[in-house]
Amino acid sequence: MKIAVRLDDITPDMDWERFLKFKALLDKYQVKPLIGVVPDNRDDNLKGSRQGAPDDFWAYVRELQSQGWSVAMHGYRHIYSTDKGGIFPLNNFSEFAGVSYEEQLRMLTGGKRMLAEKGIETDIFMAPAHSYDNNTIKALIESGFNKITDGFGDAPYIWKGITFYPISFRLSDTLKKKSGYSTMVVHAGTIREKEWQGYESYFQRQDATWINYSEYMSLKPYKRGIGGRITEYLLAKAKSVLVNHLR
């Protein structure tokens, strides 16, 4: 299977020590990921060590983009304001799901404008907590987005005018598959010391091909029907229940 990488929670005040350590892994194995940049971070939980932080965060992001890294808008302020899981219910909290269309449109256009003012253009959305609803889809299209990094499956698909780039349901199973495409989701700021070796072992596996996210986005998507969407919803709900049960 060919696997791309996405890094969530990219902010000026994130844990730079961990981020740069993971970046070193990506550089070593020549993988250019998708990074989810929060336009106006207000979530204190995303803050961490400033060791190694660049003087100009936005210039740094632009430089990564010029080197072939892909950039998504990761929500607006990364503040969870509802207890809704939306149409991809991996979690029961959200910045977007359950919020009115008008407010979602305001957040999306505002966030996109903030990024543009910093010289960062993007048309791909990364929902905080993976949670979004039908109003999000409608507002994304209205505000100039046409891609979402989320969903389950083995290839990009189109639904309601948006192209979805699926993430891994369970990485251990994804790594064993012989064909298809998926995404490994990484929150570098929360990686524990004992987990670093595991991440390197993933990149060293002979049965997985690691690709740049730009290659993933170059694939022609297929059209997914209602049956596929229902299956995806049920899988996300089942995974949410299982994860909560194990906590």
Which residue ranges define each predicted feature?
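Hydrophobic faces of well-ordered beta-strands that scaffold small-molecule active sites
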Residues: I3-L7, P33-I35, V71-H74, T122-F125, ...
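Acidic-and-aromatic substrate-binding clefts and catalytic sites of carbohydrate-active enzymes
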Residues: I10-R18, D40-D56, D83, Y101, ...
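Generic structural signal for well-ordered alpha-helices
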Residues: F19-K23, W58-R62, L105-K112, I137, ...
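C-terminal domain-boundary segment and adjacent tail
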Residues: P33-V37, T190-R247
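Short, flexible, mixed-charge acidic loops at enzyme active sites
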Residues: I79-N91
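A conserved mid-domain beta-alpha-beta active-site/ligand-binding segment of alpha/beta enzyme cores
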Residues: W159-Y202, Y213-S218
